[in-house]
Amino acid sequence: MSIQTLDKLLICHIDCSIWSGRKKLRPEDFRLANGSQLPPKDVASLGSKKICDPEALANFERLKKEAQRLCEQVGVRFLGGYAVPEDRIDQIVPELDRIGQEFAQCKQLFLDNYDQVTFNWVAKHPEFADAIRRALSPIEDVEQRLQFDYAIYRMQPADQAGGLDDKVNGMGHTLFREVARDANELFERSVAGKNQISQRALNPLKRLRDKLDGLSFLDHRVQPMVEAMDNLFVRLPKTGPVTDNLYHELMATILILSDPDKMRMHGEGQLDIRQLMPKPEPKPAQPVSAQADNLRAIPQPTVRPNLGSTVPNSFYF
């Protein structure tokens, strides 16, 4: 099964390094009161100090996470990278190129302003100015630490593949776990505590559907979930919030997606979405008096005598 599965996948590896803007704390960085001393190294470590404003590095972290989310939308984590269906790779390559270009622009801007950024950080913390200045990295080192690139390749197992079979066969479980994580985040962020679901909240749900569809060959229990979601989506309103019975069906679908075991049970036909929907409350029975008030007399036809009939002559003397 491993070879057939790998033939349908490409591996995307994100290679992104970010300068931390931190250095290890040293004993000389502390001003100790008379008689005070630092704990020995085998008891506690000194940790690190920030030698640069973290806000100045925020764009690099943002772009790294954006690249990771992009790959997670269509693929699953695999051997330090992402296993992406071959027919979906064109969806992410242009975006990864864009992220790489933006990373390079942010890097150049940061390096151009490195001296000013570190000067401002020292000025903001004058009591630690000497400790920060001593720890500042040369700009050449910072330039080498800020890198973004990606590689896409096909994996070809060797004759002696070790535990590769187990890792490939485990990608289905990884898919269920990742979908459940994202479905739980969607529930907490956009659904919990509400009695309707907005059109905006449907977008991440549709992305989960597309991810499951693209990777359905990893586990035979995935396709029934895709079909159930398709059946639901075609009945949802195109505008406005989802309410009433469709809301309950959507909630039940999210509930299944948020649990790997429930997704497997659904795929095996052991769990139906309708089982998780609230049953409609029966209408209360009307009191007997109310029923009587609602009764109406049904008019009966009036029987009239046939006055036009002829009286026999023998009736008279």
Q: Could you say what each language-model-derived stretch is?
A:
Residues M1-L136:
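Leu/Val/Ala/Ile-rich N-terminal alpha-helices, chiefly Sec-type signal peptides and the beginnings
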Residues K8, K23-K24, K41, K49-K50, ...:
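Context-gated lysine
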Residues L38-E61, E185-P237:
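Amphipathic alpha-helical interaction modules
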Residues C52-V74, S137-F148, G170, T174-R181, ...:
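Amphipathic, heptad-repeat alpha-helices with coiled-coil/zipper character that mediate oligomerization
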Residues E86-K194:
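Long amphipathic alpha-helical segments with strong coiled-coil/leucine-zipper propensity
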Residues V122, A129, R133, S190, ...:
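A sequence-level detector of short, solvent-exposed, charge-rich linear segments
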Residues L202-F317:
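C-terminal structured domains
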